Amino acid sequence: MRPVPALIVGGGPAGAAAAIMLARAGVAAHLIDRHAGPHESVCGGFLGWDALAALRDLGVDALALGARPIGRLRLLSGERCVELALPHAAAGLSRRVLDEALIGRARAVGATVLRGRAVRAADPAGRSIRFDDGEELAGGALFLATGKHELRGLARDLGQRREAPCAGLRAVLPGCPTLAGVIEMHLFDRGYAGLLLQEDGSANLCLSVARERLAGGVAALMAEIMAEAPRLAARMDGKMPAHFEAIAGVPYGWRVAATAPGIFRIGDQGAVIASLAGDGIAIALGSGMSAAQTFAGGGPEAAERWQAQWHRRSRRPIGIAEALRRGAAGPVGRALLMRLLRWMPGLGAQAALLTRVSARRTGERRSGARSAPGPD
């Protein structure tokens, strides 16, 4: 089995960003995507300013793809509402459109893209993967970018977590003019929902909720949430959406501290930030770009150093996002948060800035490679 120079498992933003940067650096990158074509994803409709900057550096113009500009955050808890200006311009874009643009860009700059191929297992010692048809492929380096999905042989170690993972749900609602330029965050017990306009004018609804609240099923959960969040219920016209996409076992706050030689864990395989912070896509793009640049400058042996640096870099933003998520999970914390933001709205912008993980790559001085632009 002859290895390829760089093997990337996962065709989402992290994997595609890594493939683009590797191809630009002259590294023959092979990107494996389990989806044969365009598809939706539960998370990732919000593009913060740092994600937009990273996309521009990758050669993707989100606004040209139809992304809807967002300049304000509308935070709702029960009947209470606070509206705040974001510190910089953001946008809303479906993952279907974003992922296709990134994969197309990776192919255009020279990466080999294999679509519709499901990877069943990995061998970290050999930096190899096995497809569901038994075929195997090895890489000089293996970039793990499978998002929230585990890969046998390289599954994330979640055994030391004190908190059970959360569940994510996504549905599409009819758009309305009052969502223009705004992302709405609806807070309720042990969860929250985000609502924004997509490029086609529909509204993307994403919910994060403690997994135990799903014990009675989605219909029962949504009935409870609509009672707790009447303004969200009004957005849904009092009716449950006909279709939900779901993912279970989302370990918010998790970060990997170490990796095997030649294995780069990027995106949610390296660090999982609460979606309340809106930084998931930026972290995916930034980690993919940074890891690719580190590999191009330092080879497979730089993986362990890079992973440790990314762990340190993401510690404070993810810690702050976790504090906000946990604080908003209960009625006392939500009430305090809403009062603080009403009295001192500047705190919202400051919190948004503190939960960002810069797209600028780690280890840039040691590898000598060019850094990706991003906010300081």
Q: What positions do the PLM features span?
A:
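Redox-cofactor binding/interface segments in oxidoreductases and associated redox assembly factors
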Residues: 9, 144-145, 265
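Predominantly flavin-linked oxidoreductase catalytic cores and closely associated redox partners
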Residues: 105-235
